[in-house]
Amino acid sequence: MSATALQVKTTQKPNSRLAVEVAVPAERCQANYEAAVTRLSRTTNLPGFRKGKVPRAVLLQQIGPVRIRATALESLVDAVWREVLEQESIEPLCEPELSGGFDALLESFQPSEALTLTLETDVTPTPKLKATKGLQAEAEVVTFDPSKVDELIEQSRKQLATLVPVESRPAAIGDIAVVSFSGTYDDDGSAIEGGSSDSMDVDLEDGQMIPGFVEGIIGMNLGDEKTVDCHFPDDYSKEDARGRKASFVINLKELKTRELPDLDDAFAQQSSDKATLEELRNDLEQRLQEDAKRRDRSNRHDALLEALTEQLEVDLPNTLVQQEIRNLVEQTASQFAQQGMDVKSMFTPELVRSLMESSRPEAEERLRRSFALTALAESEDLKIEESEISAKVKEVSRELSGERDIDPARLRQAVSDDLLKDKLLDWLEDNSTITEKVLESEAKTSKPAAKSKGSKTKSTKTKTNKANTEKPASDKSKS
């Protein structure tokens, strides 16, 4: 063994933390110290001496031995770490940390003596699955509901309706009321922040306002003033109002009703790009059927992924958890910005800390799902052929032909991840048992989303949409 060779001992710690103990020979320490002295003599400017010509004794006196030792130790630790990474094939997720800190190590560092130091870093964990086949899952079944076609058509009719003033009758469900109002809390009589308006349109439909508000307007005549008792829900957006009772003094200033367009071909042309009402209905039916298939497949895949994750054994590194938390907070900020909110003023340090704390469970769950897929691909040797990836990249590139700033490498990686995730979930579906369940909530179907390919049904399958966000974890990650 060379006199300058490093002796390395690695110890696995919790949270995928790796401790690396390194014994550095005295010869290596001395050589590094001498190199530091040489570098400092070349770069230090001292009065009366040319640059690079400062005598060693003068340099030690002017700079001081501690600074020189610190400079030598910094370069030594950096060089040792780079050599250890290559020697031990370690791929760190973050910068290393010195156990005990730099100052403590500096106190013990003597250039003429051997040095033992310990560096710690996070590394990518090796996920393992207790089982991959025969998993049991339960998923909510989603089926096409023909009545949703009529609901969507009625929504379009409302959007295209003509508002006609009403003067001869009281306010009724379905009307548009123009009101002024002011509200106070019942418990202390204080004014409700944002709880007043000189003129606001209120759609008199259930669920449009807090409980009691719309109900209180029903039956009022133009010019009437009425005090209405309301109750803020426990999950209301403003925390200080949650669960509190309130009173609103409401004045009915105007009342309008909707005059709906006739259900004919003219309506179809006005509300869509279809020429006839029959074409419109057929198009909506097709979109709703595709949406039901997409959501049903998403539910099955999400249930399967949940079942697979229950079989996972993995120690999540804090570096990846914090990175995923930041991603979630950034997504939240982006959503607020898209809604026109001032993110800079909203996202105070206190709010960011709160969001990061509350996002941790979701971040950990996302990572666990990603590692579960990674472990499945490794366990069952499931891969995507390069030809499949290339074909899909071409297809996506054509769809994005008008987009700018598309990174080909990132696009290819994203396509590869998506294809592999689909293949893994399809494999799971073929090798698992999924029990279907029908919930009453299925009656509340959302509007159709973008088209997606149909899914096969072999097994029988709970939850919605999480499976679309997880992809196999990358094999390698570096800081």
UniProtKB/Swiss-Prot annotation:
Its main location: cytoplasm. Residues 453-464 have a biased composition (Basic residues). GO terms for molecular function: peptidyl-prolyl cis-trans isomerase activity; protein folding chaperone; ribosome binding. Consists of 3 domains; the N-terminus binds the ribosome, the middle domain has PPIase activity, while the C-terminus has intrinsic chaperone activity on its own. PANTHER family: TRIGGER FACTOR CHAPERONE AND PEPTIDYL-PROLYL CIS/TRANS ISOMERASE (PTHR30560), TRIGGER FACTOR-LIKE PROTEIN TIG, CHLOROPLASTIC (PTHR30560:SF3). Pfam families: FKBP_C, Trigger_C, Trigger_N. It is an enzyme of class 5 (isomerase). Involved in protein export. Acts as a chaperone by maintaining the newly synthesized protein in an open conformation. Functions as a peptidyl-prolyl cis-trans isomerase. One of its GO terms (cellular component) is cytoplasm. Keywords: Cell cycle, Cell division, Chaperone, Cytoplasm, Isomerase, Rotamase. Residues 468-479 have a biased composition (Basic and acidic residues). It catalyses: [protein]-peptidylproline (omega=180) = [protein]-peptidylproline (omega=0). It is found in: Cytoplasm. It comes from Prochlorococcus marinus (strain MIT 9313). Belongs to the FKBP-type PPIase family. Tig subfamily. This is Trigger factor. Its EC number is 5.2.1.8. InterPro entries: PPIase_dom_sf, PPIase_FKBP_dom, Trig_fac, Trigger_fac_C, Trigger_fac_C_sf, Trigger_fac_ribosome-bd_bac, Trigger_fac_ribosome-bd_sf, Trigger_fact/SurA_dom_sf. One of its GO terms (biological process) is 'de novo' cotranslational protein folding. Residues 174-261 form the PPIase FKBP-type domain. Residues 438-479 are annotated as: Disordered.
